[in-house]
């Protein structure tokens, strides 16, 4: 039982001026009223704080704010399933990311007569992922071409994903996809996978920065479906990841002066042909003809006045890896010649990134333009 607080012993006080009786009565009333209001305000604040605390606990598992697909309601007790908030799908940046990735896949697989229209629906069974990886890596995978049953599809998907993970060499916590999530058509998992592939192989595309998806995590508790929402980041600063985050004169040319860009291209074509013509070679397309690294290696030998042994590089590279090795070797020759390490990555050149190729060739032009 609560007890009333005991009164404190009286303490002598200093004399105070006497107030008129009516004013004292008013002060007493207002004091009581003020104390009551203060207590009520404090009680309200405590109540609101308690409610806020309860909401913080309960809201993450609140009733689902939208209608679920019938398949997504078939959960066992305590089973958890994730899905994209339908409202998040209309985000312009997410739409842009999906379009860029779809266009990239279709460009890579143009010779396979494969047209992707929907990432989740077209990639879940592993068929397109297999073809995409084979094309990017120039390696044939030992898997069945056509699979109909779910078991066969998952077996194929397992093989494809294992090979992809082996190539990407990502730490386990960075791998945000698996057989079950991809086969379940998880857009989040498939996007993470495609972004990782495009960045590893230095795809000649520009991914939008800071794309996030609102993900709804659904769980069945005591027979009731409850949910919580989390923000899943798909892309961060893609410029920094690609190694092209520092703007230079070529960024300005591409963005604001296409006419001057054409002049630069013609100047560089004239420069490289002046030397490559000595080997009866000629360049007309800068972005494509330097992509395998062969012309870069030969050009460095001509500029520095030495013969590059043919066993030092791949004269007819037939895989992405061999092309990257060629370009890397050419970069080493440039550094041996006194140039700084090129800012672009070898993969950028192999993927026909024009801006990266121009940067490398312009550095050569600056140093060797007077070489006959």
From Swiss-Prot:
GO terms for biological process: actin cytoskeleton organization; actin-mediated cell contraction; cilium assembly; establishment or maintenance of cell polarity; establishment or maintenance of cell polarity regulating cell shape; heterotypic cell-cell adhesion; outflow tract septum morphogenesis; protein stabilization. Residues 95-202, 262-369 form the Calponin-homology (CH) domain. It comes from the Eukaryota. Changing residue 271 to D: Loss of interaction with ILK. Loss of localization to focal adhesions. It is found in: Cell junction, Focal adhesion; Cell membrane; Cytoplasm, Cytoskeleton; Cytoplasm, Myofibril, Sarcomere, Z line. Its main location: other. The modification Phosphoserine is found at residues 8, 14, 19, 28, 62. Widely expressed, with highest levels in heart, skeletal muscle, kidney and liver. Keywords: Acetylation, Actin-binding, Angiogenesis, Cell adhesion, Cell junction, Cell membrane, Cell shape, Chemotaxis, Cilium biogenesis/degradation, Cytoplasm, Cytoskeleton, Membrane, Phosphoprotein, Repeat. SMART domains: CH (SM00033). It is a peripheral membrane protein. Signal peptide: none annotated. InterPro entries: CH_dom (IPR001715), CH_dom_sf (IPR036872), Parvin (IPR028433). Residues 223-372 are annotated as: Required for interaction with TESK1 and ILK. Residues 1-11 have a biased composition (Low complexity). CDD domains: CH_PARVA_rpt1, CH_PARVA_rpt2. Gene3D superfamilies: Calponin-like domain (1.10.418.10). Residues 1-45 are annotated as: Disordered. Residues 21-25 are annotated as: Interaction with ARHGAP31. The modification N-acetylalanine is found at residue 2. GO terms for cellular component: actin cytoskeleton; cytoplasm; cytosol; focal adhesion; plasma membrane; Z disc. Changing residue 8 to D: Loss of interaction with TESK1, however no effect on interaction with ILK. Plays a role in sarcomere organization and in smooth muscle cell contraction. Required for normal development of the embryonic cardiovascular system, and for normal septation of the heart outflow tract. Plays a role in sprouting angiogenesis and is required for normal adhesion of vascular smooth muscle cells to endothelial cells during blood vessel development. Plays a role in the reorganization of the actin cytoskeleton, formation of lamellipodia and ciliogenesis. Plays a role in the establishment of cell polarity, cell adhesion, cell spreading, and directed cell migration. Component of the heterotrimeric IPP (ILK-PINCH-PARVIN) complex composed of ILK, LIMS1/PINCH and PARVA; the complex binds to F-actin via the C-terminal tail of LIMS1 and the N-terminal region of PARVA, promoting F-actin filament bundling. Formation of the IPP complex is dependent on protein kinase C and precedes integrin-mediated cell adhesion and spreading. Interacts with TGFB1I1. Interacts with ARHGAP31. Interacts with the actin cytoskeleton. Interacts (via C-terminus) with TESK1 (via C-terminus); the interaction inhibits TESK1 kinase activity. Interacts with PXN/PAXILLIN (via LD motif 4). Belongs to the parvin family. This is Alpha-parvin. It comes from Homo sapiens (Human). The gene is PARVA.
């Amino acid at each position: 039982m609560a007890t009333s607080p005991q009164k404190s012993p009286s303490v002598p006080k200093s004399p105070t001026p006497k107030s008129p009786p009516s004013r004292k009565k008013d002060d007493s009333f207002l004091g009581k009223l003020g104390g009551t209001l203060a207590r009520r305000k404090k009680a309200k604040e405590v109540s609101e704080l308690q409610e806020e605390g309860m909401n913080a606990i309960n809201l993450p598992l609140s009733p689902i704010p939208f209608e679920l697909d019938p398949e997504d309601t078939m959960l066992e007790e305590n089973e958890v399933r994730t899905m994209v908030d339908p409202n998040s799908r209309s985000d312009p940046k997410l739409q842009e990311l999906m379009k860029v990735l779809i266009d990239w896949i279709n460009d890579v697989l143009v010779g396979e007569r494969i047209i992707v229209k929907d990432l989740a629906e077209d990639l879940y069974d592993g068929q397109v992922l297999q073809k995409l990886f084979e094309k990017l890596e120039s390696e044939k995978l030992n898997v069945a071409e056509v699979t109909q049953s779910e078991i066969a599809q998952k077996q194929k998907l397992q093989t494809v994903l294992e090979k992809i993970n082996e190539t990407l060499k990502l730490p386990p916590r960075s791998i945000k996809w698996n057989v079950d999530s991809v086969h379940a058509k998880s857009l989040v998992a498939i996007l993470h996978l495609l972004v990782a592939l495009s960045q590893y192989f230095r795809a000649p595309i520009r991914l939008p920065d800071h794309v996030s998806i609102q993900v709804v995590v659904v769980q069945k508790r005591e027979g009731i479906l409850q949910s919580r929402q989390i923000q899943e980041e798909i892309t961060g600063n893609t410029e920094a990841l690609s190694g092209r985050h520092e703007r230079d004169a070529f960024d300005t040319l591409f963005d604001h002066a296409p006419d001057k860009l054409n002049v630069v291209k013609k100047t560089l074509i004239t420069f490289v042909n002046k030397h490559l013509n000595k080997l009866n070679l000629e360049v007309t397309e800068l972005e494509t003809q330097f992509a395998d690294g062969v012309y870069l290696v030969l050009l460095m030998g001509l500029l520095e006045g030495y013969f590059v042994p043919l066993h030092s590089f791949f004269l007819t590279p037939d895989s992405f890896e061999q092309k990257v090795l060629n370009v890397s070797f050419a970069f080493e020759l440039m550094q041996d010649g006194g140039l700084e390490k090129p800012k672009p990555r070898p993969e950028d050149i192999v993927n026909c990134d024009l801006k990266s190729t121009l940067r490398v060739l312009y550095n050569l032009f600056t140093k060797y333009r007077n070489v006959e």
